[in-house]
């Protein structure tokens, strides 16, 4: 086997690899798969934010089948960070308060938000199931106590403990931070996935869990 042939083969392999790399780099395009937010979410580096609402049917569907698997595939690059949208649903404000408290409890206990023991997960899916599966409306905004009780019962928390936890500075900071969810949600609705606070993924372009994870990985390293 001649050295000239080996050199030619080596160059061919290098060219093929370069073309493959170039193709991979251009597999996702701005304006088709994602957009750059004009107003980035502050202090969101190395995060995969999901803006959601308990009253959003697609948020429920994505949380059942997509959010967890994608977050697991990109956990080495970004941390999953839920942002509840206070402005959607009759009880958006109350839901945000319940979720912020439960997230703080999970974080203090070192429990993943995807773990079966997560109080956030228990409350979230209790609301999803009640609202979307059983069509519960809690008197259409006239019974906030009943709405809150649904989440607290699922998470195993008393009203007194909830009231006390709600005053925690960490919880209040979370609620303040979540106000940025509105500007993101009004672009294409919810759910809305944002990488590093800058890149909004177009949900209509998501083809599979693997392709979404690949997109998140690409955006996370920009």
Explain the meaning of each model-derived region.
Residues 24, 29, 35, 129-132, ...:
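Compositionally biased, intrinsically disordered low-complexity regions enriched in proline and serine
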Residues 49, 192-193:
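Catalytic His-Asp charge-relay segment
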């Amino acid at each position: 086997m001649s050295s000239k042939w080996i050199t030619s083969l080596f160059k061919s392999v290098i060219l093929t690899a370069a073309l493959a790399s170039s193709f991979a780099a251009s597999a996702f395009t701005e304006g088709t798969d994602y957009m750059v937010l004009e107003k980035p979410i502050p202090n969101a580096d190395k995060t995969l934010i999901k803006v959601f609402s308990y009253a959003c049917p697609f948020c429920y569907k994505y949380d059942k089948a997509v959010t967890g698997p994608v977050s697991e595939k990109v956990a080495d690059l970004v941390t999953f960070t839920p942002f509840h949208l206070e402005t959607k649903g009759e009880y958006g404000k109350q839901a945000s308060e319940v979720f912020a408290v439960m997230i703080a409890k999970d974080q203090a206990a070192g429990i993943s938000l995807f773990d079966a023991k997560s109080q956030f997960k228990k409350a979230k899916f209790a609301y999803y199931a009640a609202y979307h599966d059983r069509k519960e409306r809690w008197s259409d905004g006239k019974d906030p106590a009943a709405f809150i009780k649904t989440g607290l019962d699922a998470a195993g928390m008393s009203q007194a403990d909830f009231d006390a936890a709600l005053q925690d500075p960490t919880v209040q900071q979370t609620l303040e931070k979540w106000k940025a969810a509105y500007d993101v949600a009004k672009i294409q609705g919810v759910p809305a996935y944002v990488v590093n606070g800058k890149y909004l993924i177009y949900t209509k372009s998501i083809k599979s869990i693997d392709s979404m994870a690949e997109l998140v990985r690409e955006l996370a390293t920009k």
